[in-house]
A protein has these predicted regions:
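Mg2+-dependent prenyl diphosphate-binding active-site environment of isoprenoid biosynthetic enzymes
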Residues: 15, 24, 28-274, 280-293
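N-terminal amphipathic/basic leader segments beginning at the initiator methionine
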Residues: 1-25
């Protein structure tokens, strides 16, 4: 029987939401405005795809969701901080995210910047909290390095810089690949590997999961590019057509829609092949890959 990926994602997203509610500061704790801004963006919706990837990565090597929940929450906080900052006028200048006004439209630019900063730093506190859960210290060191590299100048932030510097320019496939593998795929790859590390994955398993995660992350961003062209703002929960309006470097702009779709599906097929040795334990990762290329928003 094939996995019901929607139910799988919904069940784990609910668990992640409950954990996030526990770990985030209360809105009644000072500074109240900052904590309201942090919680506003974290709980503004979203698929919780990255924390679900953390959990699926652990499950692929026999781990359990409860042992990786702090790491799953940390990854979601890093992702949310990046969205808050991406939406600022100095960057993508977007008014809506996940169907609601962006953080800076509600709280102002200064508080939005600080809310992002606070989420990023809290994320690393949560990663360290895995010590209290009795996890292996060597694995935690490796996870800290993995996620810091994926989130920083060697990963997500570096990809964002390349994205900004490419606006309005004619760029080739190599530049688009660099942007997407760093800005998006790096954190998805790290999410899967981090979950597996906490669950005691072997070096060879981490190599295979890294290959699968990189391909799934790139496929996800290619589909984001496609949906920016084909979906409505209501379906996306954010302004559609922004990539073309801002002359961003995207897969459809360089390769066209059809070639982009074919490439995304090929990447998912390669990810499935990399997961073959994991057997049924990796079925959630396979199903998430299929979801990535079939989603409509």
């Amino acid at each position: 029987m094939s996995l019901d990926v929607q139910s799988y994602m919904a069940e784990r997203a609910r668990a992640v939401d409950a954990a996030l509610a526990r770990h985030l500061p209360s809105e009644s704790d000072p500074p109240e405005t900052l904590h309201k801004a942090m919680r506003y963006s974290v709980f503004a919706g979203g698929k919780r795809l990255r924390p679900v990837f953390v959990i699926a990565g652990a499950e692929a090597v026999g781990g359990r969701m409860d042992t990786v929940m702090e790491t799953a929450c940390a990854v979601e906080m890093i992702h949310t901080y990046s969205l808050i900052h991406d939406d600022l006028p100095a960057m993508d200048n977007d008014d809506f995210r996940r169907g609601v006004p962006t953080n800076h439209k509600v709280f102002g630019e200064a508080i939005a910047i600080l809310a992002g900063d606070a989420l990023l730093t809290l994320a690393f506190r949560l990663l360290a909290d895995n010590f209290a859960a009795g996890s292996d210290a060597h694995a935690l060191r490796n996870i800290l390095i993995e996620i810091a590299d994926a989130a920083g100048s060697a990963g997500m932030v570096g990809g964002q810089v390349a994205d900004i510097e490419s606006e309005g320019k004619r760029v080739g496939a190599e530049t688009v690949d660099y942007i997407h593998t760093h800005k998006t795929a790096a954190l998805i790859r790290a999410s899967i590997r981090a979950g597996a590390m906490l669950a005691g994955a072997t070096p060879s398993q981490l190599v295979a999961l890294g290959l699968a995660g990189g391909n799934l992350g790139l496929a996800f961003q290619i589909m984001d590019d496609i949906l920016d062209v084909t979906a409505t703002s209501e379906e996306l929960g954010k302004t559609a057509g922004k990539d073309q309006a801002q002359q961003k470097a995207t897969y459809p702009a360089v390769h066209g829609l059809e070639v982009s779709r074919i490439h995304a599906k090929a990447l998912v097929s390669e990810a499935h092949a990399a997961l073959q040795s994991f057997g049924p334990r990796a079925e959630p990762l396979r199903a998430l890959g299929s979801f990535i290329v079939e989603r409509k928003a």
